Amino acid sequence: MTAVAIPAVRDYLTDLQGRIVAALEQAGGEAFRTDAWQRAEGGGGVSRLLEGGQLFERAGVLFSHVKGTRLPPSASAHRPELAGRGWEAMGVSMVLHPRNPYVPTTHMNVRMFVAAARPGHAESDVFWFGGGLDLTPYYPFEDDARHFHRACRDALDPHGADYYPRYKQWCDEYFFLKHRNETRGIGGIFFDDLNDPGFDASFALTRSVGDSFLPAYLPIVQARRDMPYGERERDFQAYRRGRYVEFNLVFDRGTLFGLQSGGRTESILLSMPPLAQWRYDWQPQAGTPEAALAEFLRPREWV
């Protein structure tokens, strides 16, 4: 496989979505809704979602394969030579917002983008892969952070020992709220614009990232899901979820691309938490579990 094999990527992504949803349904004992949709400009997708669950207060596992005739500005900003080309984008993107504040929120995304060669021009299709997974705890545990990062490292090491440290640093830098001077969570891995190893190797690495999600996250869910909590923890969870909203609406490239490309708003904003709150200049009391989170919201080596 040397050309851009769009059907193979699509088959992998739809299978990944199905496997993840099946595992989450088994863990939570609640069924996800299925919402298939079409995009007038080209393409469509399938959204699998759950709202008001006992384990997951809001969860979305989304597949999309969309097309357009001209690259939107967010996609061509780093590649101005591709401006004006037709394009295809496909991926699986997911965000899970658990109900129990001791279970962390998580995000995972794997995707491929293709800028098509223009008829009559001496050029070829240009592809690149991207993705990653990251963890956003409210009441963090070092064991959870180390487990999550070990799973990320183990996914990437077969493709080269330099990938994990590079993509870990990229994640720390990407999921950073500049106006708050803090990371969104404890990181994970993040990559974009991957095509230099060639199509086969780039696709293989992306599959490893997607396949690593369940072993990275589900053991943490099982370890924390039955921890008792009360109004104090739920209140702090809602406050910290506000940071998630701030990042997604101000900095996230995927959100910006979706909105600029005329994407499906319901799918794009499914990453938002169901409840969030803001307070003016609130600071947790020193020595409390809430104050301990600040020590985790800065880049550090976990493995």
Curated annotation (Swiss-Prot):
The keyword Ion transport does not apply. The active site is at H107 (proton donor). It catalyses: coproporphyrinogen III + O2 + 2 H(+) = protoporphyrinogen IX + 2 CO2 + 2 H2O. One of its GO terms (biological process) is protoporphyrinogen IX biosynthetic process. It is an enzyme of class 1 (oxidoreductase). Its cofactor is a divalent metal cation. Pathway: Porphyrin-containing compound metabolism; protoporphyrin-IX biosynthesis; protoporphyrinogen-IX from coproporphyrinogen-III (O2 route): step 1/1. Its main location: cytoplasm. The record marks H179 as: Important for dimerization. Keywords: Cytoplasm, Heme biosynthesis, Metal-binding, Oxidoreductase, Porphyrin biosynthesis. Pfam families: Coprogen_oxidas. InterPro entries: Coprogen_oxidase_aer, Coprogen_oxidase_aer_sf, Coprogen_oxidase_CS. GO terms for cellular component: cytoplasm. Its EC number is 1.3.3.3. Residues 244-279 are annotated as: Important for dimerization. Homodimer. Involved in the heme biosynthesis. Catalyzes the aerobic oxidative decarboxylation of propionate groups of rings A and B of coproporphyrinogen-III to yield the vinyl groups in protoporphyrinogen-IX. Belongs to the aerobic coproporphyrinogen-III oxidase family. This is Oxygen-dependent coproporphyrinogen-III oxidase. It comes from Bordetella parapertussis (strain 12822 / ATCC BAA-587 / NCTC 13253).
